Amino acid sequence: MSDALNRSSINSEKVTLRKAINKRLRTLDAVQKQNASTTISNKLIKLIKDNSSILCFSPIQSEPNIRPAIQHWLKSNFRVCLPKVEGDHIQSYTVNENDNLISSSMGILEPNPFNSIKISPVEIDFILVPGIGFTRDGKRLGRGGGFYDKYLEKTLPQTLKIGIAFSLQIIDTMRTENHDVPVDLLITD
């Protein structure tokens, strides 16, 4: 099979997987999401104990709410960063408890670059990576823009990439492409 046909086949499979997993996500009610999110936040707090640099994410409705973990790290004086989309890639910026986040064109809360410090990917110790789906061996199905893949390629080998998902987002297998960057660890409810 030619490379172009293979890429087309993989992309088609990813579209199908995204639809199937999004359908599963719609079965979670608010209480189930909150309980699962609390479990995930507690696991993250237990995992990341040392004062570290952490790239988190601002959860959207279909993602686990990790805000309690973020608040814990902020109060414990960790260097907490959030991603901001700039063109076709993301940059990490520091945030603090008093920061006013701004809404991106996609409705995601991002740091205001005018009152935040840009942090290089090589300065991050832990990266919390959202996704539509994950396999147990770390393959990640994102939203299709490649933003996280591009960012993760720039990190140091010792940076721990942690996939964050509800347990119903875990899939058995998935084909990937060369540019797809896996996570090192998966945290679910």
State where each predicted segment sits.
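Conserved phosphate- and dinucleotide-binding cores of soluble alpha/beta proteins
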Residues: 4, 91-189
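N-terminal active-site beta-alpha-beta segment that forms phosphate/nucleotide-binding
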Residues: 2-123
